[in-house]
Amino acid sequence: MTKTVEIKKTFQPFVKWVGGKRGLLSQIIPLLPEKFNNYFEPFVGGGALFFELYSKGLLKNKEVFLFDINSELINAYNVVKKYPTKLINELETFKQNHSKEFYYEIRAWDRENDFLQRSDVQRASRFIYLNKTCFNGLYRVNKNNQNNVPMGSYKNPNICDYSVILSASQALQNVNILNVSYKEVLKYASKDDLVYFDPPYFPLTQTASFTSYSEFEFLEKEQIELFEIFKNLSKIGCNVIQSNSDTEFIKDLYKDFEIKEIFANRFINSKSDSRGKISEIVIRNQI
């Protein structure tokens, strides 16, 4: 049975996400243009910036496009948008059954041949359940696109947050949600649109890389391809902004654009003892 819940007047991500921007919004939002047409997030992840801009009324009367190559993430967005009540009911069942045995049983669904025959609501519930109960909130897959994150040690994980799901559903009602590569933004974006890229970061060290958000790698070659897309969007008059790691490789690549240093507290990390405040950069063109 679904509870009657008042939708929050503020909006926030319904999943935790590696590199999520909730703690950086106060530093990123002042770097955005005051005026823009449509809004694009081609690496949406948890969507923290989108939800904050929506909450502030800054996306009113604008067309919004959220992309991600991660098919399970995008399915979850679409289910939150279209079927929030069904999702809440399913998550309540997951919550009631939560245990170590249940976690690994649910995680193993993507090893089954009929995984994609499961309903969209079932798959979205699995995705959110694993996100809320796995080790450090990671989403990581192997080369076969199978989730391989162990269970976390949370005593009382918040598996089903009614209010967050309902408010997110409200925010997503008129949004275009697409399971496509970030490169597709070139087909949609036009002059004076705002494009915010939040890609898998270029690693600070050889051992610091974490790019397994999907079965697709995002390494040096892919960073250079992103740079070319960034330049092309700038040439057609888009407002383009990107978050990335504070590395010489990235700063040299974008040396002809404005680069701002910001500071992040990173709380999601596969090595909990390596958490802490680190510098990041925000790159933007000047339209």
Residues of each region from the PLM?
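Class I S-adenosyl-L-methionine
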Residues: 1-24, 34, 262-271, 276-282
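SAM-dependent nucleic-acid methyltransferase catalytic core
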Residues: 2-27, 81-196, 200-210, 225, ...
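Long, positively charged, glycine-interspersed low-complexity recognition regions
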Residues: 216-287
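Short, polar loop motifs at secondary-structure junctions
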Residues: 45, 164-165, 244-248
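Short His-Asn-centered micro-motif
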Residues: 42-43, 67, 178-180, 197, ...
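Glycine-rich helix-loop-beta junction characteristic of Rossmann-like nucleotide cofactor-binding loops
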Residues: 29-35, 57, 187-188
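Short active-site oxyanion
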Residues: 36-39, 61-63, 172-176, 230, ...
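SAM cofactor-binding core of SAM-dependent methyltransferases
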Residues: 35-114, 158
